[in-house]
Design a protein with these regions (language model features):
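Short small/polar-residue motifs
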Residues: 12-17, 43-46, 66-69, 117-118, ...
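Extended, positively charged loop/linker patches that create polyanion-binding surfaces
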Residues: 94-137
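N-terminal leader/targeting segments and the immediate start of mature chains
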Residues: 1-46, 187-196
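Short glycine/serine/proline-enriched coil/turn segments at secondary-structure junctions
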Residues: 37-41, 65, 144
Length: 196
């Protein structure tokens, strides 16, 4: 369900890329409820996303709060690692491939999630397109003079990912990070890599 049905402002990816964005988070953590549809197959769960100095740890949980997969992104060496903890390993890998396609898309979609467009306000929703993706941002949660969307929806062909932000936090230094109880970025040594 959407927060507000006013017509969103349409922003091109080129304009978005050229923005000087005060909401460009270097260190950010958020938790969210997610709904994913791939064709007619649906999945609900939770997402816990921690980003610190260009490294992200994304934990995907099922509706019962059991971890099914962890994704690790590192912008410094353009690496993506996936630790699949589910019994349905092959199915989850296929779904992730369908959603993202390649590594470049993963990092661009991460930017689209972590850095909302400057046009997004409490009164103005935004719609942005990148390649085959349409990204809708609705509502904002404001903290420390920064905003983060309440709701993000990504659509591509027969894939829809809805992200309902529960809470988010940004911080400036390691001390603040540790006080908030967020874990350090540590990608496991033995991990499945399958996106090129």
């Amino acid at each position: 369900a959407s927060i507000d049905k006013t017509q969103p402002e349409i922003v091109s990816y080129k304009d978005y890329s050229n923005q000087n964005n005060v909401n460009d988070f270097v260190n950010l953590a958020f938790s969210a409820k997610i709904t994913l549809f791939v064709e007619k197959k649906g999945f609900t769960g939770k997402l816990i996303w921690n980003t610190k100095n260009g490294k992200s740890s994304i934990t995907i949980l099922n509706p019962f709060n059991s971890v099914i997969s962890k994704v690790y992104l590192d912008k410094s060496n353009n690496s993506l690692k996936i630790s699949n903890l589910s019994k349905n390993k092959k199915e989850i890998e296929d779904i992730i491939r369908q959603i993202f396609g390649n590594k470049k898309n993963v990092f661009i979609l991460e930017k689209l999630i972590m850095t909302p467009p400057t046009q997004l306000t409490s009164k103005k929703n935004v719609s942005l397109s990148y390649a085959d993706w349409k990204v809708d941002y609705e509502g904002v949660i404001e903290k420390e003079n920064k905003i983060f969307p309440k709701y993000i929806e990504l659509n591509k062909n027969k894939i829809t990912l809805k992200i309902y932000i529960i809470k988010w936090k940004s911080w400036l230094n390691k001390k603040d990070y540790k006080q908030e109880g967020y874990e350090e970025f540590k990608a496991p040594a033995k991990i499945n890599l399958f996106l090129k």
